[in-house]
């Protein structure tokens, strides 16, 4: 009885079940051709062949019914070769046949390496030849980048190399490499060998060998080679009539085909074989690139007994059973569709289990409890550290956010307390004497007034004395006034005679002044005002050029060296100034309890208010000042700290009253600017001097009304030389060059003092072979300069007048 009918999994009868075997052939277990399984799993068809062979050689004792008669013979060698690679290599004939196939495929080194590893494992480690053999195996198969080395993992090759270098020879040294080569052969070469022409030819010739013939051998060979052709009645089949290339196919078992001669059946088989072998010869997996035919249900278990019109023969010739109508034999697509339908119909046929196509992930593999606990503890500790780090970062960010909010609230409260309301319009018309008294109260708030004779270091004044002091001078400065130094007591001081002009130039002969010197200078001027007599206010406004001259000046010269607000108020009033009014103002100094920032804002507002109410007689002077670039003075700075202040507003809407006012400034921005300026005050004096000098250098001098200048000739330098000189003082270097004869040069700022040719080449956008010429000062020619060619990348480029001037030409 068929195994399928007795299988407990298939207990019910179905119409699509395979038919029972022909009487007398019950011993041959029916299995599907491997081509059917190849359609189900096209990537592993040879394993299907192995499974079919195992099914073909199965014993009936598995079902508990005992062995059939004449089926107690052992398995044939051909059937064992298809079980696994070990059975194939364990047989001498199989190993030789497999080696011949590998030699044809040019990958015989894999088999030699496998046998070499087997032989090395059996060697004695104490023998001196063992080390030489291991080294020879390594050099022959692994070191020379052969086909064996390409199939090994890098870690395996590194392990073998290290063991050989350290002479740590072990019998299991090549086990991992042998396992990898064996796996590669099982997946590729072994599967291709089972479908190769060499193996099939050997199977065909093995049929005539008596050692391979047994009562069950034909069944096994039939399954390996394919289905036998249909024989006509009263004819005997022989091996000579069957060709080696006749593999599995489906031949329509119609009445016409059954009555055809054997030659026609063989031709149909050859046609099917050509379609099966259609593949790329360069493809290493040729056995999976084609397709094979599924067996028809009517051809599984029986042959045609006679040509009589019986139920059996009618069922064999019925096209509904064969699933291939006679008129569709030539259509390949139709054959494929019918094969797939037959495969679905015969899907319940019991077949031996085949390996899973997908392996479970590594996480699902069973692990030792101790190793699993160690991995779990390590992961939990890592997670705990990450959570603690994130929590600490969140706490820190929250603290920083709270501190910022607290600082913003404090800043807003301080700005609200320091902000001054706009002065009412009525205050603009107040008495000039009251304004003078208020300004002097801020300037003279120092203990130095109590002892005029001593040069004490007074505490820091509340007025913004650290602001860079603009230069100024009298427009009607004459020889008589400078020689005599005195004028009659009853004279009028007009606006034109006391107008101050801004000159932002550097006194190179005067070094930077410290904070103590600035305070001493201010104290001297204040003390002179406090100790002055009737001669103090009658002297003209004579300025000193430096701190030394200021200290050596006469009391009459220093008397009027106070803030420019006094001179402007005197000019604005246009009235006679007597000493009695000045003494009264000095005696009536009110106490100022406001802080520094409030004084600064009040001082700025007063300056703006004073400028707005100037008469029209000063418009000519304003026009001359409008030519000067407007800029805002910084609070810090040295070098010119000895100059007195003159209220020349730097804002355009103050210079031109007709211009609409700018939007009100932001309080927070003003506080930030004030903080920055106070920080600049605390910087070293040298740095403040260079910074203030660079800032004042950008402006140009304005001549006074009588055509004379308030500065000597040595300070009026060429603007080009001045810009070049001060650019070298900064942290950037000006680089100007002509590129390949272009008319317009290129100019760049490089943040370095010593620029090399290599750095210069890196800045060029276009790369190529060029010649580089740079201008430098030279006395060889009348022009005083030459273009010097530079070749070495490490050479520092020469400078000309504080700049680097170069030309880049293409190399011929």
Swiss-Prot record:
| Ranges of compositional bias, category Polar residues | 285-303, 475-484
Cite the InterPro entries for this sequence: Axin-like, Axin_b-cat-bd, Axin_TNKS-bd, DIX, DIX_dom_sf, RGS, RGS_sf, RGS_subdom1/3
Coarse class of the protein's main subcellular location: cytoplasm
Give UniProt keywords alphabetically: ADP-ribosylation, Cytoplasm, Developmental protein, Phosphoprotein, Ubl conjugation, Wnt signaling pathway
* PTM entry text: ADP-ribosylated by tankyrase tnks and tnks2. Poly-ADP-ribosylated protein is recognized by rnf146, followed by ubiquitination and subsequent activation of the Wnt signaling pathway. Ubiquitinated by rnf146 when poly-ADP-ribosylated, leading to its degradation and subsequent activation of the Wnt signaling pathway.
Primary gene name: axin2
Locate the region Interaction with GSK3B.
329-415
- The name this protein goes by in its record: Axin-2
* Residues covered by the DIX domain: 730-812
Q: Where is the composition biased (Acidic residues)?
A: 401-410
Name of a matching Pfam family: DIX
**Any one of the GO BP annotations:** cell development
Regions of biased composition (Basic and acidic residues) lie at: 388-397, 672-683
Q: Which GO terms describe its cellular component?
A: beta-catenin destruction complex; cytoplasm; nucleus; plasma membrane
Q: What is the lineage of its organism?
A: Eukaryota, Metazoa, Chordata, Craniata, Vertebrata
Interaction with beta-catenin: annotated segments: 415-467
- PANTHER family, from UniProt? AXIN, AXIN-2
Q: Specify residue ranges for compositional bias: Low complexity.
A: 305-323, 411-421
Superkingdom field: Eukaryota
Q: Which residues lie within the region annotated Disordered?
A: 1-43, 275-326, 388-430, 446-484, 609-726
Stated role: Component of the beta-catenin destruction complex required for regulating ctnnb1 levels through phosphorylation and ubiquitination, and modulating Wnt-signaling. Controls dorsoventral patterning by down-regulating ctnnb1 to inhibit the Wnt signaling pathway and ventralize embryos.
Q: Which GO terms describe its molecular function?
A: beta-catenin binding; I-SMAD binding; molecular adaptor activity; protein kinase binding; ubiquitin protein ligase binding
Whom does it interact with, and what assembly results? Interacts with hwa; leading to promote the tankyrase-mediated degradation of axin1.
């Amino acid at each position: 009885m068929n195994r399928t009918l007795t299988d407990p999994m298939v207990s019910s009868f179905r119409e699509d079940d395979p038919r029972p075997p022909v009487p007398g052939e019950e011993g041959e277990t029916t299995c599907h051709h491997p081509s059917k399984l190849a359609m189900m799993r096209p990537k592993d068809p040879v394993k299907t062949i192995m499974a079919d062979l195992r099914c073909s050689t199965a014993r009936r004792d598995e079902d508990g019914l005992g062995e059939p008669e004449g089926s107690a013979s052992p398995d044939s060698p051909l059937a064992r070769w298809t079980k696994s690679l070990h059975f194939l290599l364990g047989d001498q004939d199989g190993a030789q046949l497999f080696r011949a196939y590998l030699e044809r495929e040019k990958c015989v080194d894999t088999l030699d390496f496998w046998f070499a590893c087997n032989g090395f494992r059996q060697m004695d480690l104490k023998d001196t030849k063992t080390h030489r053999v291991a080294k020879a195996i390594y050099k022959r198969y692994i070191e020379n980048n052969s086909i064996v080395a390409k199939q090994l993992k890098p870690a395996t090759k590194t392990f073998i190399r290290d063991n050989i270098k350290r002479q740590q020879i072990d019998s299991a040294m090549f086990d991992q490499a042998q396992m990898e080569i064996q796996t590669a052969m099982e997946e590729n070469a072994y599967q291709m060998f089972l479908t190769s022409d060499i193996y099939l030819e050997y199977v065909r010739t093995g049929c005539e060998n008596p050692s391979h013939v047994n009562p069950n051998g034909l069944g096994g060979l039939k399954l390996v080679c394919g289905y036998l052709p249909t024989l006509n009645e009263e004819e005997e089949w022989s091996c000579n009539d069957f060709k080696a290339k006749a593999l599995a196919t489906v031949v329509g078992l119609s009445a016409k085909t059954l009555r055809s001669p054997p030659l026609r059946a063989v031709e149909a088989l050859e046609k099917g074989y050509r379609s099966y072998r259609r593949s790329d010869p360069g493809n290493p997996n040729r056995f999976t690139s084609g397709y094979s035919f599924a067996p028809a249900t009517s051809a599984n278990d029986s042959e045609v007994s006679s040509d009589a019109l019986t139920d059996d023969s009618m069922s064999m010739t019925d096209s509904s059973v064969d699933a291939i109508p006679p008129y569709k034999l030539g259509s390949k697509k139709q054959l494929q569709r019918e094969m797939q339908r037959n495969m679905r119909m015969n899907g319940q046929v019991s077949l031996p289990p085949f390996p899973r196509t997908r392996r479970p992930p590594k996480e699902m593999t069973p692990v030792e409890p101790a190793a699993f606990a160690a991995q779990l503890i390590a992961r939990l500790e890592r997670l705990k550290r990450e959570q603690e780090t994130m929590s600490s970062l969140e706490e820190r960010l929250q603290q920083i956010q709270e501190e910022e909010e607290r600082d913003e609230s404090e800043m807003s409260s301080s700005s609200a307390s320091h902000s001054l309301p706009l002065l009412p319009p009525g205050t603009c018309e107040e008495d000039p004497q009251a304004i003078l008294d208020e300004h002097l109260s801020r300037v003279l708030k120092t203990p130095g007034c109590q002892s005029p004779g001593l040069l004490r270091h007074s505490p820091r004044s509340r007025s913004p004395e650290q602001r860079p002091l603009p230069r100024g001078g009298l427009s009607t400065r004459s020889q008589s006034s400078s020689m005599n130094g005195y004028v009659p007591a009853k004279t009028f001081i007009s606006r034109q005679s006391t107008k101050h002009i801004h000159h932002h130039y550097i006194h190179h002969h005067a070094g930077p002044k410290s904070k103590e010197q600035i305070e001493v200078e201010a104290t001297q001027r204040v003390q002179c005002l406090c100790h002055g007599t009737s001669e103090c206010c009658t002297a003209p406004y004579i300025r000193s050029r430096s701190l030394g001259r200021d200290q050596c000046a006469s009391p009459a010269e220093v008397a009027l060296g106070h803030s420019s607000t006094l001179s402007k108020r005197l000019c604005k009033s246009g009235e006679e100034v007597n000493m009695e009014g000045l003494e009264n103002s000095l005696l009536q100094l009110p106490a100022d309890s406001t802080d520094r920032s409030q004084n600064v804002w009040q001082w700025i507002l007063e300056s703006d208010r004073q400028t707005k109410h100037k008469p029209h007689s000063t418009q000519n002077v304003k026009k001359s000042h409008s030519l000067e670039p407007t800029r805002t003075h910084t609070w810090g700075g040295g070098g010119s700290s000895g100059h007195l202040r003159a209220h020349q507003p730097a804002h355009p809407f103050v210079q031109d009253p007709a211009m609409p006012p700018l939007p009100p400034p932001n309080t927070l921005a003003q506080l930030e600017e004030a903080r920055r300026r106070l920080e600049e005050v605390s910087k070293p004096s040298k740095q403040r001097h260079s910074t203030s000098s660079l800032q004042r250098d950008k402006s140009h001098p304005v001549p006074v009304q009588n055509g004379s200048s308030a500065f000597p000739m040595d300070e009026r330098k060429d603007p080009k030389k001045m810009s070049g000189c001060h650019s070298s003082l900064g942290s950037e270097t000006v680089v100007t060059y002509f590129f390949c004869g272009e008319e317009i040069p290129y100019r760049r700022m490089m943040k370095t003092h010593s620029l090399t040719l290599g750095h210069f080449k890196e800045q060029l956008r276009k790369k190529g072979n060029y010649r580089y010429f740079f201008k430098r000062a030279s006395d060889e020619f009348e022009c005083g300069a030459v273009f010097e060619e530079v070749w070495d990348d490490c050479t520092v480029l020469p400078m000309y007048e504080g700049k680097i001037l170069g030309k880049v030409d293409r190399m011929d």
